């Protein structure tokens, strides 16, 4: 379901932030323990739900608390950990069994409106990441490694990343190279009528699942927007608060949702779904999931960023990234209805979304910060994206932090995104019956998006408040931030994101 979250919500990108390389933050050494506590609320609504074939509710609500801790080990090394939850309710995914299910977790009515199935309408995604970084002052370089894990009822993910950074002798320029891998394990949960073997016109696989090896692909956009850490505040403009564009397909604020140290991701995974599902849904629902097949998605990304200070007022960076995905790139419970001449939905030809089992994404980004005056900064960002699904996209963002007083900054922002549709996308009921690949997921459609909002940060030089813990240590409440954003897509999807963050050291 993270995919649903990421793609609809996550308005993330994100946000892959895999594509997060665009928002890379330079490795630095801390001299105190630093703790970030963040809470994000996200809601969206629209009428192009992929679960119901591209026509139907996209309503979703998400609550996401997160805590990150960075601990200096010595003068050159830092250890960090991030722990978070994403609890969401989704009217869209509640329709997985819209026309009948054979799971023991629910009893179906002949009338869809009378069904009370919570198979996927509510879930909690849990995630954890650990990172270690080390500075090497003798050669002006640094290295960091990160491991992440996340799980929700149908997906379990493991993620690893390594970053190498080299600074010039004067510290004015830097080169950063990052490589990462995601391994996502999916439960193949198909729509109820397909599990029953009805209306597919294609036979079924095991247990009535429409599962020939090609069926498990995935428009995996979600994946990308699943970067381990979504940067909500984007106040450090080395970062990109919306991973969404990387996968341009997901330009929602998913990306305003999750935060973690560097990467936000669609980490939802696990083979032992059976056991964990007990915790989520109780023995009855866990038993319902035990019969499902599983499939795996592998995502590899490599990125490089070069940047530095051009003069006393301007600094800039350029980032290039390549992402390669293999395995299940479709979402099994996404329906696709075909152009078969039948008007009554219950009798239309329906299949599970089918996409190629590999995908290559390429992106190039440019970022610049111009210090107009002592109280005004202009931050500009542009990204170009293309993939072999036929999508081409461009994103532009501007943010203007304004210092209003001692430690108080107001930063309005605006982001525009446009993309072409995937070769495999058609709207509800528009696919030809002989199509090899097909999806009605509007994250892969042609659209434009507008995202706008405002952030406020209070960060006095000496902190908001502080007190002595002992002779050597002092607790300091360093900063408090608030961020509000609105997102609108030309297809009708709208979203709101509210984020609160505070930072303290000791």
Can you describe what each PLM-predicted range is?
Residues 48-51, 56, 84-128, 171-217, ...:
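Outer-membrane beta-barrel translocator/channel fold
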Residues 59-65, 122-128, 156-160, 296-302, ...:
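Residues that define the transmembrane beta-barrel architecture of outer-membrane proteins
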Residues 105-116, 323, 329-358, 363-367, ...:
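Outer membrane beta-barrel transmembrane domains
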Residues 74-76, 137-139, 169-171, 309-313, ...:
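Outer-membrane beta-barrel channels and translocator barrels
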Residues 67-71, 130-134, 162-166, 302-308, ...:
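Residues on the lipid-exposed face of transmembrane beta-strands in outer-membrane beta-barrel proteins
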Residues 41-64:
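Surface-exposed strand-loop-strand hairpins of Gram-negative outer-membrane beta-barrel proteins
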Residues 39-45, 85-89, 147-153, 166-168, ...:
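Transmembrane beta-strands of outer-membrane beta-barrel pores
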Residues 35-37, 81, 143-145, 175-179, ...:
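Membrane-embedded beta-strand positions of outer-membrane beta-barrel proteins
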């Amino acid at each position: 379901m993270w995919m649903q979250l990421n793609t609809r919500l996550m308005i993330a990108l994100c946000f892959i932030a895999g594509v997060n390389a665009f928002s890379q933050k330079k490795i630095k050494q801390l001299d105190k323990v630093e703790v970030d506590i963040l809470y994000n609320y996200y809601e969206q609504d629209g009428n192009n739900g992929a679960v119901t074939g591209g026509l139907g509710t996209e309503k979703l609500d998400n609550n996401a608390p997160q805590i990150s801790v960075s601990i200096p080990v010595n003068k050159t090394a830092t250890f960090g950990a991030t722990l978070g939850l994403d609890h969401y309710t989704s009217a869209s995914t509640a329709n997985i069994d819209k026309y009948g299910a054979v799971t023991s977790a629910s009893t179906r009515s002949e009338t869809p409106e009378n069904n009370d199935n919570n198979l996927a309408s509510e879930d909690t995604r849990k995630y954890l990441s650990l990172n270690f970084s080390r500075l090497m002052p003798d050669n002006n370089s640094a290295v960091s490694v990160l491991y992440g894990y996340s799980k929700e009822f149908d997906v379990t993910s493991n993620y690893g990343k390594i970053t190498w950074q080299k600074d010039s002798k004067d510290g004015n320029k830097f080169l950063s190279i990052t490589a990462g891998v995601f391994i996502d394990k999916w439960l193949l949960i198909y729509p109820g009528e397909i599990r029953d073997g009805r209306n597919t016109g294609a036979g079924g696989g095991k247990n009535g699942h429409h599962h020939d090896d090609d069926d498990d692909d995935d428009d995996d956009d979600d994946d990308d927007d699943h970067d381990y850490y979504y940067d909500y505040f984007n106040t450090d403009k080395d970062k990109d608060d919306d991973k969404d564009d990387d996968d341009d397909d997901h330009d929602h604020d998913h990306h305003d949702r999750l935060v973690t140290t560097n990467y936000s991701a669609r980490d939802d995974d696990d083979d032992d779904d059976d056991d964990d599902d007990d915790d989520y849904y109780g023995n009855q629902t866990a038993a319902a999931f035990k019969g499902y097949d599983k499939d795996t998605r592998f995502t590899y990304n490599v990125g490089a960023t070069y940047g530095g200070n051009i003069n006393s007022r301007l600094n800039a960076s350029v980032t290039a990234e390549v992402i390669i995905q293999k395995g299940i790139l479709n979402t099994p419970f996404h329906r696709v209805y075909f152009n078969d001449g039948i008007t009554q939905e219950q009798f239309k030809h329906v299949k599970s979304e089918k996409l190629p089992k590999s995908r290559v994404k390429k992106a190039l980004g440019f970022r610049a910060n111009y210090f107009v005056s002592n109280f005004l900064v202009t931050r500009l960002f542009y990204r170009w994206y293309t993939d072999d699904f036929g999508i081409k996209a461009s994103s532009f963002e501007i943010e203007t932090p304004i210092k209003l007083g001692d430690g108080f900054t107001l930063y309005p922002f605006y982001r525009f995104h446009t993309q072409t549709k995937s070769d495999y996308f058609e709207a509800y009921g528009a696919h030809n019956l002989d199509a090899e690949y097909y999806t009605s997921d509007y994250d892969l459609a042609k659209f434009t998006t507008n995202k706008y909002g405002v952030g406020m940060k209070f960060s006095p030089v000496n902190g908001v408040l502080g007190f002595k813990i002992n002779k050597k240590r002092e607790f300091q409440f360093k900063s408090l931030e608030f961020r509000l954003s609105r997102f609108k897509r030309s297809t009708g999807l709208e979203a709101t994101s509210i984020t609160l963050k505070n930072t303290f050291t000791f």
